[in-house]
Amino acid sequence: MQFPMGPACIFLRKGIAEKQRERPLGPDEIEELREAFLEFDKDRDGFISCKDLGNLMRTMGYMPTEMELIELGQQIRMNLGGRVDFDDFVELMTPKLLAETAGMIGVQEMRDAFKEFDANGDGEITLGELQQAMQRLLGDKLTSQEISEVVQEADINGDGTVDFEEFVKMMSR
């Protein structure tokens, strides 16, 4: 039998990634956008042109296709009078930034995911807690035996539970 850790972890990572896409941008991300925007706002009037937007996106590592730029340009001309201010720029870039970082799981996201599994909040995930969480997340896709094997594999110290450190190691496999 193939070890079920892979599908369970992939599903959990996908769930965390979806939450990442729904979160607001953090102060560091907004500051990164502000610095990039100011670099292209040559006349310091608080606006950049459609053309500058494409170049700005490229300097930030996004490679919009010509079609995407045309669509953005039309949207900007129709809704924003042909120019983009910082707030509009943030609104345009937020989905791209969130999609880019969605696959990256940070410590806080790991803690949040761990708390989802640790139903009683004692700092350890028991077989029962994992079964409940997997049932919620995956439905009937994993059997009790498979879930038990997940705990056994993740339980490095052999105490029958998965602590946060073991959880992080399990998720990074």
UniProtKB/Swiss-Prot annotation:
Binding-site positions, Ca(2+) 1: D41, D43, D45, D52
The residues that hold Ca(2+) 3 are D155, N157, D159, T161, E166
EF-hand domain residues are 28-63, 82-99, 105-140, 142-173
Task: Tell me if Cytoplasm is a UniProt keyword of this record.
Answer: yes
Read off the SUPFAM superfamilies from this record.
Answer: EF-hand
One GO CC annotation: cytosol
GO molecular function per UniProt = calcium channel regulator activity; calcium ion binding
Instruction: Supply the Pfam families for this chain.
Output: EF-hand_7
Where does this protein hold Ca(2+) 2?
D118, N120, D122, E124, E129
Q: What is its main location?
A: cytoplasm
Coiled-coil regions listed in the entry: none
Instruction: Report where it is expressed, by tissue.
Output: Expressed in the retina (at protein level).
Per UniProt, subcellular location reads as: Cytoplasm
Q: Which PROSITE patterns match?
A: EF_HAND_1, EF_HAND_2
The record's keywords, sorted A to Z, are: Calcium, Cytoplasm, Metal-binding, Repeat
> Can you tell which superkingdom this protein's organism belongs to?
Eukaryota
Q: Repeat: present as a keyword of the record?
A: yes
User: What does the UniProt record say this protein does?
Assistant: Inhibits calcium-dependent inactivation of L-type calcium channel and shifts voltage dependence of activation to more depolarized membrane potentials. Involved in the transmission of light signals. May positively regulate neurotransmitter vesicle endocytosis and exocytosis in a salt-dependent manner. May play a role in the extension and network organization of neurites.
PANTHER family, sorted: CALCIUM-BINDING PROTEIN 1-RELATED, CALCIUM-BINDING PROTEIN 5
Q: How does it assemble?
A: Interacts with CACNA1C (via C-terminal CDB motif) in a calcium-dependent manner. Interacts with STXBP1. Interacts with MYO6.
What's the protein here called?
Calcium-binding protein 5
Lineage runs:
Eukaryota, Metazoa, Chordata, Craniata, Vertebrata
* Gene (UniProt): CABP5
